[in-house]
Amino acid sequence: MAFHARITIFAEGAHGSLTKTLVKKYNLRKKSDPQTYGIGLKEVWEVPKEQWREGEITHSMGYPLDKDTYGGGFMYHFGENLVSLGLVVGLDYRNPYLNPYQEFQVHTSSLTILY
């Protein structure tokens, strides 16, 4: 298939097969320091007073992601008995079956510190 246009915009996403082909064919990463992007998922939970620790911040790296996927989690205690729980997953992951939302569910279900 041939495209003929003054400008062509490709907007298929960071993992698109066409994008990867174009980057490789035209060496689009040469002399660049490309940014990386991630998707963040967050929930706010109300917890019992005895499990809430005002101002406490916890960060984690890796788990539950595999060794080839970067990211990590966070837990912020704030407000009155509120905890913000989140997971960030780098969008350069290679596993096409990785589901950031499912990984977030694994992350939040493993937080025994809140139970």
Annotate each PLM feature:
Residues 1-114:
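Predominantly flavin-linked oxidoreductase catalytic cores and closely associated redox partners
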